[in-house]
């Protein structure tokens, strides 16, 4: 398969995995291992990365094996998002940042105006910017025009498990994209992840679908395989949809024994 390229980074795996809500660290680590994810995301605000006395994800993971993608979860405006991103950078983490500016506490949908503003400000600061956005086609294009390094449209609200509720809009975003499209949020099953890849997405970022599963380790493996299958299917090219049947076996040139 073709590698996933985001800014200066190249990855074999197209599964980006969140690190929150796992039952315990052992389950988390095993799930990460079987997923073969190379990019791990986490909320900067949920860790005291400057306090050595406070245990956190970075202490327990072999961070040299992964590319870390800190996110600005908890930010309510562009200024807060930029502040969180700078905190992550100052701690020595990757310059790549997932911009997350929530505009509605009930749906956890992103604020389009503040997301645009934060993305522009962080690009000016030299960050590799991956904004979490809705399935708004125009907003995705405007983010792309700013120069972001990937676009991360939600399939449905964060943690909902509803899957891809608007595949048409998602397909429009993918068709117009000149940067990678990573489907983020709302994935609930391996079928959802495979569908995203079949639509032409470059990758899938998920967390709750794995960490909240009855068996997170098995689900991590299932997501890995479904994303690989969906991508292979997209690269192979599906047959055209037709209204009428077409015989799969040739009828001409066959001798009929009476």
From Swiss-Prot:
GO cellular component, one term: cytoplasm
Metabolic or biological pathway, per its Swiss-Prot or TrEMBL entry: Cofactor biosynthesis; thiamine diphosphate biosynthesis
Keyword Membrane applies: no
Reaction catalysed by this enzyme: [ThiS sulfur-carrier protein]-C-terminal-Gly-aminoethanethioate + 2-iminoacetate + 1-deoxy-D-xylulose 5-phosphate = [ThiS sulfur-carrier protein]-C-terminal Gly-Gly + 2-[(2R,5Z)-2-carboxy-4-methylthiazol-5(2H)-ylidene]ethyl phosphate + 2 H2O + H(+)
GO molecular function: thiazole synthase activity
Enzyme class: transferase
Annotated SUPFAM superfamilies: ThiG-like
Protein EC: 2.8.1.10
UniProt keyword annotations, A-Z: Cytoplasm, Schiff base, Thiamine biosynthesis, Transferase
Active site: 98 (schiff-base intermediate with dxp)
Function noted in UniProt: Catalyzes the rearrangement of 1-deoxy-D-xylulose 5-phosphate (DXP) to produce the thiazole phosphate moiety of thiamine. Sulfur is provided by the thiocarboxylate moiety of the carrier protein ThiS. In vitro, sulfur can be provided by H(2)S.
HAMAP family membership: ThiG
Family affiliation: Belongs to the ThiG family.
Subunit structure: Homotetramer. Forms heterodimers with either ThiH or ThiS.
Protein name stated in the entry: Thiazole synthase
Organism field: Bacillus thuringiensis subsp. konkukian (strain 97-27)
């Amino acid at each position: 398969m073709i590698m996933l390229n985001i800014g200066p980074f190249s990855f074999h795996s197209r599964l980006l995995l969140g690190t929150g809500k796992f039952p315990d660290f052992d389950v988390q680590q095993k799930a990460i291992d079987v997923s073969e994810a190379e990019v791990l995301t986490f909320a900067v605000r949920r860790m005291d990365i400057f306090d050595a006395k406070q245990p956190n994800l970075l202490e327990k993971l072999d961070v040299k094996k992964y590319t870390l993608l800190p996110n600005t979860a908890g930010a309510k405006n562009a200024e807060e998002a930029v502040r969180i991103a700078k905190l992550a950078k100052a701690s020595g983490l990757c310059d790549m940042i997932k911009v997350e500016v929530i505009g509605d506490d009930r749906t956890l949908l992103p604020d389009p105006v503040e997301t645009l503003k934060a993305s522009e400000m962080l690009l000016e600061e030299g960050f590799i910017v991956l904004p979490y956005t809705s399935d708004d086609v125009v907003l995705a294009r405007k983010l792309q025009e700013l120069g972001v390094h990937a676009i991360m449209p939600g399939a449905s609200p964060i943690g909902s498990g509803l899957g891809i509720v608007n595949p048409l809009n998602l397909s429009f975003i993918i068709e117009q994209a000149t940067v990678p499209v990573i489907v983020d949020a709302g994935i609930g099953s391996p079928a959802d992840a495979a569908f995203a890849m079949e639509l032409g997405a470059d990758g899938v970022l998920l967390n709750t679908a794995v960490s909240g599963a009855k068996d997170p380790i098995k689900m991590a493996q299932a997501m890995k395989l479904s994303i690989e299958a969906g991508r292979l299917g997209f690269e192979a090219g599906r047959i055209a949809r037709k209204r009428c049947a077409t015989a799969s076996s040739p009828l001409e040139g066959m001798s009929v024994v009476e």
